Amino acid sequence: MRQLNRLNQFQRLWQQSQGGPQQTCVAEMARHCICSERHLRTLLSQWQHAGWLSWRGEPGRGKQGQIVFLRSPEQLRQQLLQQQLDAGDAAEALQLLDLPPERLINMLRPLMGGQWQNDTPVLRIPYYRPMESTEPRQITGRAEQHLARQIYSGLTRFEQDEPVGDLAHHWQHDEASYGWLFWLRPQLMWHNDEPLQAAQLVAQFRQLLRDTRVSMLLADVLSVDAPHPLAVRFVLRRPDFWLPHRLAHLLCLLPHPIDPATGSGPWKLRHFSAELVRIESHARWHLQRPLLQAVEYWITPQLFDPALGSSCRHPVQIAIGDAAELRTLQPVSSSISLGFCYLVCRPRAGFTPDQTRTLFQLIQQSGIVSRLPLDEGLITPSKELLPGWSVPLIDAVTVPLPATLTLHYQLPVELHQMSQALVALLKQHGCTLKVVFHPVKNWHGIDPLDEADIVMGDRLIGDAPVFTLASWLQTDPLWRPLWPTLQGEEIQAQLLSIQQIADDETRARSLHQLYHQLMTGGILLPLFNYRYQIYAPPGVEGIELNTLGWFDFSRAWISPPIDPPCSCSAAD
């Protein structure tokens, strides 16, 4: 980037006097700018023409002259940054941000949040870490899950926790509920403006079924075909009334068969790097088009507290500033996460169900969750598994715990404090707790988990929480060691029975009963939930927190720069 190189050379020269006038010569300036004297003369001419400085040199080699700086490197960097953004080249603009945090904040503050560029609304979000991926079957973080749902579509999607049409507008099943037809919308388009065809979706599903997790999620799918250019058919080995939910699952989002970065959702991926993610509105989306033109994640960890690590403490911010300034902004939406951090016990020889219930009772009665040394307002002890599904208080006959137990746990970092609290609690009751930490966000591919007596982790719950809990038991490797046991076989039989219940409310009640058994049986104990919050600056509207702790980009909008501003209301 030639402009950035010129700016860096100018800054090296400016730093010799911190912007004050200098008596110097061409040779000395060339040494500071790390270039030839000939090139330095060219730079001086360009800088004078651009109004960056004035130079009065004496004729003759080695003669001194006076240089007067008219602009500071900071001003020029800000100007160049704005020019790059106005040109829609955020990736180039990011190269200008190699600055100390305190200077970076001043430079970025006016550029974050909602901006109008060339009559186009753009939303910029500072984020504390690089995005892992957008491939639906590779991601683990809630930010990545949210982003994937903006880029990719499935046959169905979730709206208010229920499956509704996405690529398909309606579906039906035969009388026996073994055959399901999903009717596709006409004129569907990929992000590359290529028509989306039923045959492509069938090929994608057949490929997905080779994936271990997808094969567990769609375990009862025998075949997929396209009996018509606007229809996709599934044949099942047994009735499964979760099928429309399953097809809206993250694992069933459908990338383009040749280019996995291309989807058919409301937003198309334009740039993905460790420094910047940019998505743009898909003009030919089959549902309501987004009101913004682009959303950018600027990966700026310098602006966030490094001590937070991978903590959920990082708020979903669309404004920038230090903590004091954030307190002056209005929190536009907040909620308690449906997802929770959990503790799972594995009853076996040497660790009986009575002992697991005793452990649950000790945790509940000790109140250690509410006393964890975490920032106030970050978590709240779990009282309900889901709204209306209360966590039962264990009232068991206390029995001695085993002399030693092994705990395996994963991220988030708040579980570090929980593990330390458990070590201290169990020590008081004659039990030594061996602790093994896995720096991962899910249990896929973690073989030593079979050795664990106790497991702690984070169960993210987005849309359709009842279905999410059903699929958790079916697809998470966390539960695999339980399945060969008599209790595990009973749970699997109950799950198969539940999926064949046609009525939604009856199906939900049956799953509630199953989870109640897991909690009272000393297998599952929800520990705590998180508090989500979004801060927004003036002018950014339509922001409402979703179950992933983010907001629907397609509903956000930015007030146009009208002077004077006028009040407005939603259309009837």
Predicted regions and their residues:
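Aromatic- and charge-enriched surface segment that lines or borders ligand/interaction sites
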Residues: 18-21, 41-43, 140-142, 147, ...
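Ligand-site clamp/hinge motif
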Residues: 284-326
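Surface-exposed binding/hinge segments that line
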Residues: 214-276
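Ligand/substrate-recognition segments at binding pockets and active sites
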Residues: 19-28, 33-42, 51, 55-57, ...
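A bilobed periplasmic-binding-protein/Venus flytrap-type ligand-binding module shared by bacterial periplasmic
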Residues: 280-283, 335-358
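A structural "hinge/loop" feature
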Residues: 130-144, 194, 243-249, 535-552
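Detector for C-terminal structural segments
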Residues: 48, 58, 358-392, 417-421, ...
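N-terminal lobe/hinge region of extracytoplasmic solute-binding protein
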Residues: 126-173, 570
